């Protein structure tokens, strides 16, 4: 009942005094994919290209306006194209003038914008995928519609979302770490 418990006294190791012995760490600003880096620019270009091609493929069909989900996909990809293109220009500017884009307000704006566009793009891609499956598998009226174009545009919208997700997560993580 009154058993003794051992006392635990952790012993701290002395910090290294020689700067050469200190472990090197990765600074948050060195992460690829952050705003103002070449990786961030690559992600923005990929987002823009995938969303732009999805928009072009969907808009090339004549019967997309008859389905609300496809109209939503077109609207979401337009917004995704505008957002990604504008941030790609900001990234190019930051790379050219070697400027840091890690201002708290800028990172907060990037994270909020990426979150909104990610939610819209993912919702549009999911709704378009549902309608495409309905048309192709359930109703079997793919011969009358442009199912190949619908599937391609939906897949490209998902790819745009996959390219957007790392940007959002890195910006959100950077914002939360401050």
From Swiss-Prot:
Q: Which domain of life is it from?
A: Eukaryota
Stretch list, region Disordered: 1-24
Q: Where is the protein localized?
A: Cell membrane
Sequence ranges on the Extracellular membrane side: 59-69, 127-152
Stated membrane topology is: Multi-pass membrane protein
Q: Which residues lie on this side of the membrane: Cytoplasmic?
A: 1-37, 91-105, 174-178
InterPro entries named among the record's database cross-references: CASP_dom, CASPL-5
Pfam family example for this protein? CASP_dom
What cellular component GO annotations does this protein have? membrane; plasma membrane
Print the keywords alphabetically: Cell membrane, Membrane, Transmembrane, Transmembrane helix
Is Nucleotide-binding set as a keyword in this record? no
The residues that cross the membrane are 38-58, 70-90, 106-126, 153-173
- Family membership, please give it: Belongs to the Casparian strip membrane proteins (CASP) family.
Report the PANTHER family cross-referenced here.
CASP-LIKE PROTEIN 5A1, CASP-LIKE PROTEIN 5B3
Could you describe the subunit structure of this protein?
Answer: Homodimer and heterodimers.
> What is the protein name given in its UniProt record?
CASP-like protein 5A1
